[in-house]
Amino acid sequence: MNNLNYGVIGNCRTAALISQNGNIEWLCFPDFDSPSIFASMLDREKGGAFGFEVSGDYRITQNYVPHTNILSTQFSSDEGEFVVLDYMPCYRSQDETGHYLPAELYRYIHWIKGKPRFKINYHPAPNYAQGQVILNITPQYIESYCSFDNKDRQYLYAVSYTHLTLPTN
């Protein structure tokens, strides 16, 4: 673990660590004391991550949107540019706590210009990477869970205004 330069997003219920190249490398979900889903910062081989693969000519910069906990990772090259905005929502509510903290993480991919080419790598490793990961892929979402604990499931939803191709089983 040579590089500890991570962005942090969270909502007072849990938090994620996002590397300089836009990979979620640590996330316990849905709560701080829950088992990890992504832990590649500890084990690159089987820890799990959720990120982007771009060619070597991309320049990647990262900063926070001013006055927010929204992390912006910008990918730029001669062929195109896009930005990824990462955040976890926290809403005001009328209950005794005053806040609603859903177990949700958002990764908004925004096209800036050109024709950027990238690959999304989604490799969850639920429950501290103990057991086989089961992925159910549908046109609307990817469901993932650990083979020995099928009650704790995570869903990755993809919404796109352009053509999006998800692999099938």
Labelled PLM ranges:
Residues 1-49, 59-85:
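Beta-strand-rich N-terminal accessory domains
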Residues 80-126, 164:
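Acidic, contiguous internal or C-terminal segments within carbohydrate-active enzymes
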Residues 2, 156-161:
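Compositionally biased, intrinsically disordered low-complexity segments enriched in polar/Pro/Gly
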Residues 162-168:
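Conserved small/polar residues in nucleotide/adenosyl-binding loops
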Residues 127-134:
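Short aromatic-acidic-glycine turn motif
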Residues 57-102, 136, 140-158:
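Extended, loop-rich substrate-binding clefts of extracytoplasmic carbohydrate-active enzymes
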